[in-house]
UniProtKB/Swiss-Prot annotation:
Belongs to the UppP family. The lineage of its organism: Bacteria, Pseudomonadati, Bacteroidota, Bacteroidia, Bacteroidales. InterPro entries: UppP (IPR003824). Bacitracin is thought to be involved in the inhibition of peptidoglycan synthesis by sequestering undecaprenyl diphosphate, thereby reducing the pool of lipid carrier available. This is Undecaprenyl-diphosphatase. The chain crosses the membrane at residues 41-61, 82-102, 106-126, 140-160, 180-200, 213-233, 245-265. Its EC number is 3.6.1.27. It is found in: Cell inner membrane. It comes from Bacteroides fragilis (strain YCH46).
């Protein structure tokens, strides 16, 4: 992987991790364009995912600081309930990761057709959430946190946007727009770090191929993903507040159709 390829893929990861257009789907498309096999860029994938976690920590630092300050009071307050909701939202993705990891990895290697189909599904979800006008709730309940977690678990499919699925689901449930965007970005931190840790351990044990990627490419990819992630995270929060997700639905529909057509021509 050349440094300019790492730059482009890093920018794609940072932007699409937060924008509701599927980071996994766009990385798959980008890797296919550059002729990079999935097994060859595991180390790069870990690096850019960790970079987006740092982006979240930077942009949502005030919220994270608020959570930890309240959590260490060791009492049942709003901060503690927030953490409980995040833990509840992690249950579905945890079950998928533990019991269905091999099946999910097999789907990731199934080509661009599944990516295109899932992008169309993302477009449908975003459209439904845009036109539905449920009464907004003040806070995200435990029940809603679990349902949003189910949406996140389904979004392990390449092309089905994680942020798009979780935010669209929350909007359909009537959750507060501003709080929903923050919750969606915070709830993904533990799963991303957990997956990166497991993949890193596999590489150390020799159970997975790290890929012969130059250090410069890894550094460039990290910086690109971090900077673009910071911009996209802040931008996405404002987009959700203003209810402008329909534009991303149109984008996903177009890219989905093009991807399906290209997959059939290969």
């Amino acid at each position: 992987m050349e440094w300019f390829e790492a730059l482009i893929l890093g920018l794609i990861q940072g932007l699409t991790e937060y924008l509701p257009v599927s980071s996994s789907g766009h990385l798959a498309i980008g890797s296919a364009l550059f002729g990079i096999e999935g097994e060859e860029n595991l180390a790069f994938t870990i690096v850019v995912h960790v970079a987006t976690v740092f982006s979240t920590l930077v942009i949502l630092w005030k919220e994270i600081d608020w959570i930890f300050r309240g959590l260490f009071k060791f009492e049942m307050n709003s901060e503690t309930r927030y953490v409980i909701n995040i833990l509840i939202s992690m249950l579905p993705i945890g079950i998928v990761g533990v019991f269905f990891k091999d099946e999910v990895e097999a789907i990731f290697g199934s080509g661009l057709l599944i990516v295109g189909c899932m992008l169309l599904l993302t477009a449908a979800l975003l459209s439904f959430s845009y036109y539905a006008k449920p009464r907004q709730k003040e806070n995200i309940s435990m029940k809603d946190a679990f349902i949003i977690g189910l949406a996140q678990a389904c979004a392990v499919l390449p092309g089905l946007s994680r942020s798009g699925s979780t935010i669209a689901t929350g909007l359909l449930l009537g959750d507060n727009k501003a709080k929903l965007a923050q919750f969606s970005f915070l709830m993904v931190i533990p799963p991303i770090l957990g997956e990166a840790l497991l993949d890193g351990m596999k590489m150390i044990k020799g159970e997975a191929i790290a890929g012969d990627i130059p250090t410069l490419s890894l550094i460039v990819g990290f910086i690109a993903a971090f900077v673009s992630g910071c911009l996209a995270c802040k931008w996405m929060i404002n987009i959700v507040k203003k209810g402008k997700l329909i534009y991303f639905a149109i984008y996903c529909a177009i890219v989905g159709v093009v991807t399906i057509v290209v997959s059939q021509l290969q």
